[in-house]
Amino acid sequence: RVDGSEQHTLSCYRGISCGLGSHVSSVAQHLLKEGTSPEHLYPYTGRDDPCNQKTPTPIDAVAWSYANEWPLIFNDPWHHSRFVAGIKAALCQHGPVTASMWVTPAFRAYSNGIFNENNGVFATNGALRHSQTNHAMALVGWGLDKSSRPWRTYWIVKNSWGTDWGESGF
């Protein structure tokens, strides 16, 4: 399991801040060029701390593909299942996958369990938010909710808001 340091990226990449965040593509370019430190060497503080240049950066990022969001938006079952299978394969073959979404107040308040918000994440008042995202996270795995009928797949995400959010940051 690879646990990269969000704080290293926050502190050592000039194009990012706690208050304003950054664009996923520019952070990805930084990670591709510079790499990052393991979480245990550069733990998350959630502050705009100065960069510790002496911390090693042995974790390299690899760009291998871009997954299109359209199958999720149009909810075509055939495309959706292929899209989900592709993400699962990418997780198994390459490790964490960057995912972005529209964060709602309910998501900010998430504390435990399987988060499910049908209204607001991808649609608001019937309008699709396919091109509007305001937060990126690392997809690190998936599970199967056997308490729902039919069973539903859920994603396991590592958020960058620290261990006080969700279930220790997940």
Where are the predicted features?
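Catalytic-core signature of thiol
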Residues: 1-170
